């Protein structure tokens, strides 16, 4: 089983600027595109907001997960015609493969979400397959954030200012 976890890039901005009716229309068009990308036996779901998931049972006649993810990203990036406007959106996709990553559905969803986060931090409009090093990266980031919060609470930071000097007049700007 392969799980594709899909999140639209910048959807909140679209909703905020063009309104929820436009956002809802885009979501309906997106759902239709995802159904067309889906293979026989796939389940397409919308867990909430602008997130979608596709559960793909790997069959001998299936396309490769890489080919499916590529098709998803390309299909989602095609323009949407809504209310006389032509809108362009992109998506980030996280992919978790059961045989490689785990067998438990909750863990697969977590892994796909971690991979989705990596796709977003790597520049969006992309897909990433989960690998265990992603967990290490997230743990290191959490450790750093915790250390900074603790250092702030203990007053361990000192601020030093470097003046900006005008070289001609030798005066501080």
Label the predicted regions.
Residues 54, 89-91:
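HATPase_c (GHKL) ATP-binding subdomain of two-component histidine kinases
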Residues 140-173:
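Active-site core of bacterial EAL-family cyclic-dinucleotide phosphodiesterase domains
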Residues 44, 71, 75-81, 85, ...:
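Cyclic nucleotide signaling catalytic output domains
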Residues 5, 56, 95-97, 161:
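Sensory input modules used in signal transduction
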Residues 35, 120, 149-153:
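Short regulatory alpha-helical segment in sensory/regulatory domains of signaling proteins that mediates
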Residues 1-2, 9-39, 45-49, 53-54, ...:
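Conserved long alpha-helical elements within nucleotide-processing catalytic cores of c-di-GMP signaling
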Residues 3-5, 129:
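Core hydrophobic beta-sheet residues of small sensory/regulatory alpha/beta domains
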């Amino acid at each position: 089983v392969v799980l594709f976890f899909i999140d639209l890039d910048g959807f909140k901005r679209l909703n905020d600027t063009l309104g929820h009716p436009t956002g809802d229309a885009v979501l309906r068009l997106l759902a239709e595109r995802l159904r067309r990308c889906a293979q026989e036996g796939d389940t397409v779901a919308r867990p909430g907001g602008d997130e979608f998931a596709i559960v793909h049972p790997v069959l001998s006649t299936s396309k490769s997960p890489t080919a499916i993810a590529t098709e998803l990203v390309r299909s989602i990036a095609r323009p949407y015609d809504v209310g006389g406007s032509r809108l362009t959106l992109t998506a980030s996709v996280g992919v978790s493969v059961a045989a490689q990553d785990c067998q438990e559905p909750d863990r697969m969803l977590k892994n796909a979400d971690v991979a989705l986060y990596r796709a977003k931090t790597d520049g969006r409009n992309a897909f990433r397959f989960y690998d265990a090093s992603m967990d290490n990266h997230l743990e290191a980031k959490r450790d750093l954030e915790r250390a900074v919060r603790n250092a702030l609470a203990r007053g361990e930071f000192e601020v030093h200012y470097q003046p900006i000097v005008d070289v001609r007049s030798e005066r501080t700007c």
